[in-house]
Amino acid sequence: VVGLGNPGKEYERTRHNAGFWLVERFAVASGAHFRNDPKYQALVARLDPGGKAGNAAPAWLLMPQSFMNASGRAVQMLAGFFKLKPEEILVVHDELDFPPGVARLKQGGGIAGHNGLKDISQRLATHDYWRLRLGVGKPPPGTEGGDYVLQKPTADERAAIEAAIEKALALLPQMLAGDMQGAMNKLHTEDKPPAKKEPEKKEPPIKEPGKKEPEKKAAAVESAAAPKAPEKKGLFGGLLGKKK
């Protein structure tokens, strides 16, 4: 399980580090401990079989420390050393195409300009690894996507992202067990927004029997005189046929 983000205090609370947030919380929940491995240029934690994570085989948590656009090196080295296939790799990352509060699971597909995914795909020579996408929302007009993801989310956005992380964390043991399709079905069902309620139609008031409605007053009193013909105007608004 690879969490994507940028190392350093100045980045730890930015939208681009949503992948780090999930993997760090999963490590705590699983009782795993990260160690800095210079060989991978990453923080690495091992999940032993039969532990809290529920994995039947050994698994690893990875947080590359070489900045986002060079994330692929650590993934390539760990996958090569442990003979991991692309379909055995899950990359957790921020996603502009979904609003905060939404998490989606998919295998392969486009990378939508995400530099971390771009480097991983180039290093592995495939897009066929699994991806857990955490929605962070689209940038407002006039803001570049690259600048937006390096900013901190608002308090409400952060709360929504954390809620999506909670849902995904509950399904990670199922993912580690290999049931990606089952986990996907649950995740995509649970995070659908509730249907909008149609506004209630107001019923007209019930008339009391034998009660007449008050007559409506005329908006204007009609003049008995015939309507005057409009005055003719010439160029520049001057009146025609009118003596000074």
Model-identified regions with their sequence ranges:
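Nucleotide and nucleotide-moiety/phosphate-recognizing core
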Residues: 1-108, 118-133, 139-144, 172, ...
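Short glycine-enriched, charge-decorated loop/helix-capping segments at active-site entrances
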Residues: 104-110, 149-153
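Short glycine/serine/threonine-rich phosphate/pyrophosphate-binding segments
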Residues: 113-117
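Active-site-adjacent loop and "lid" segments of alpha/beta metabolic enzymes
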Residues: 144-158
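Helix-loop "lid/cap" segments that line or gate small-molecule binding pockets
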Residues: 149-152, 171, 175
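A non-catalytic, amphipathic alpha-helix used as a structural packing/dimerization or gating element
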Residues: 156, 160-171
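Long, low-complexity, intrinsically disordered segments
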Residues: 216-244
